[in-house]
Amino acid sequence: MVAHDAAAGVTGEGAGPPVRRAPARTYQVRTYGCQMNVHDSERLAGLLEAAGYRRATDGSEADVVVFNTCAVRENADNRLYGNLSHLAPRKRANPDMQIAVGGCLAQKDRDAVLRRAPWVDVVFGTHNIGSLPTLLERARHNKVAQVEIAEALQQFPSSLPSSRESAYAAWVSISVGCNNSCTFCIVPSLRGREVDRSPADILAEVRSLVNDGVLEVTLLGQNVNAYGVSFADPALPRNRGAFAELLRACGDIDGLERVRFTSPHPAEFTDDVIEAMAQTRNVCPALHMPLQSGSDRILRAMRRSYRAERYLGIIERVRAAIPHAAITTDLIVGFPGETEEDFAATLDVVRRARFAAAFTFQYSKRPGTPAAQLDGQLPKAVVQERYERLIALQEQISLEANRALVGQAVEVLVATGEGRKDTVTARMSGRARDGRLVHFTAGQPRVRPGDVITTKVTEAAPHHLIADAGVLTHRRTRAGDAHTAGQPGRAVGLGMPGVGLPVSAAKPGGCR
């Protein structure tokens, strides 16, 4: 009998010299877009490793390059096809190299990917990421490109093997898809209507992660407040309070120190969630809730189904229950038809809300969205000028809020890849419980990514805190042990979005 190892070659039983095993094929996954894609890319990596591939070392040329793409921004197409063009000479020089394109842009463009980049081997969509190893093998065997785009979710990505980027923080998907119809967003047409995982499955995954040493989880959904209305299991009844119950259940998991979630929709944000946030020991005092615009007229045009005063009322109640909460948001500048009066309304809400940080975007026209057909598309120069004014205002507010923390002690979950200048400044970096980025002087070599320290804030900037007072307390963790042992520890955000700008972070995206 002869057994075949798909990645390592053929070995035989019986007489004769042993057959030399061929080296495993290497892979690289390049991720663009939102935190959903980061989660899915960890599954793509897990699938490939389960199939016998191994991660390519930094700086090496991988045998398989996978692009997990985003379709939210206008430049997503140019970015993908530009990167594919850069790989074309490598593909010509090495026909055995394989290139795969997945994610939202692949779901949207489908066969057009091969028309624009005929050297691509595999195109797969958002609903069938589990097919990637099979498609790669089929393309290699048949010498023909494979395009497989499913119209509905075949399997929850969270049920697939995972190769996580971090030993200390993990993404946990609670739902896939979105039932909203924001006019600027293409995501619902690409990821489908919302489907929710069962609470039992989610909590089982969280417990498994904690058993592996994970300290922090981020619950992911396009609209986490809608969780419970579209369970995949028909035996589970609709439950409008399911998300608050899920947060409280996370509080009962021993060893789980931090719980974050992203993103809620203001139209469905309810007081039971605020109560659960305030009363559950490990839910972090942080809320990322997209506003998009402070103008009620623009919110109607966006089909956001809430108005500015409702939004401000929610954050007022959050701050009443959790006074130290850091509240962050998403804002779009230059939506079609936005007047100076509309923009002034956004500035007014930003002043009143006092966000700790804001992810601010210039409106990007996306074919296939209702907003792309609206009159009043604004000149680039007008959008840019408003964008710069908004950034200046928010940075002033962020700096004032961060300066108020100087002299205070802060607990930090130490991270890797969060500090662009850590090597030069001899600092380490991590996230406070409220999501703020903290650069601190360790003063001792024993502190490791995954450990938990406390330190005192000595300086503030709009996007980060500096703590040069030294480490006040240091707790070694199993996550730190795993990082030291060489388990995955690549750059990863501790929950997204956070307050501050790491070197490389997923962009908030999708319909929220």
Swiss-Prot record:
Domain Radical SAM core, residue spans: 164-400
PROSITE patterns, A to Z: MTTASE_N, MTTASE_RADICAL, RADICAL_SAM, TRAM
GO cellular component: cytosol
Chain ranges passing through the membrane: none
InterPro entries, alphabetized: Elp3/MiaA/NifB-like_rSAM, Methylthiotransferase, Methylthiotransferase_CS, Methylthiotransferase_N, Methylthiotransferase_N_sf, MiaB_methiolase, rSAM, rSAM_horseshoe
GO molecular function: 4 iron, 4 sulfur cluster binding; metal ion binding; N6-isopentenyladenosine methylthiotransferase activity
Residues that coordinate or bind [4Fe-4S] cluster 1: C34, C70, C104
Pfam families listed in its UniProt record: Radical_SAM (PF04055), UPF0004 (PF00919)
Reaction equations catalysed: N(6)-dimethylallyladenosine(37) in tRNA + (sulfur carrier)-SH + AH2 + 2 S-adenosyl-L-methionine = 2-methylsulfanyl-N(6)-dimethylallyladenosine(37) in tRNA + (sulfur carrier)-H + 5'-deoxyadenosine + L-methionine + A + S-adenosyl-L-homocysteine + 2 H(+)
Cofactor binding note: Binds 2 [4Fe-4S] clusters. One cluster is coordinated with 3 cysteines and an exchangeable S-adenosyl-L-methionine.
Localization per Swiss-Prot or TrEMBL: Cytoplasm
Function according to Swiss-Prot or TrEMBL: Catalyzes the methylthiolation of N6-(dimethylallyl)adenosine (i(6)A), leading to the formation of 2-methylthio-N6-(dimethylallyl)adenosine (ms(2)i(6)A) at position 37 in tRNAs that read codons beginning with uridine.
Protein name: tRNA-2-methylthio-N(6)-dimethylallyladenosine synthase
Organism: Mycobacterium bovis (strain ATCC BAA-935 / AF2122/97)
Taxonomic path: Bacteria, Bacillati, Actinomycetota, Actinomycetes, Mycobacteriales
Gene: miaB
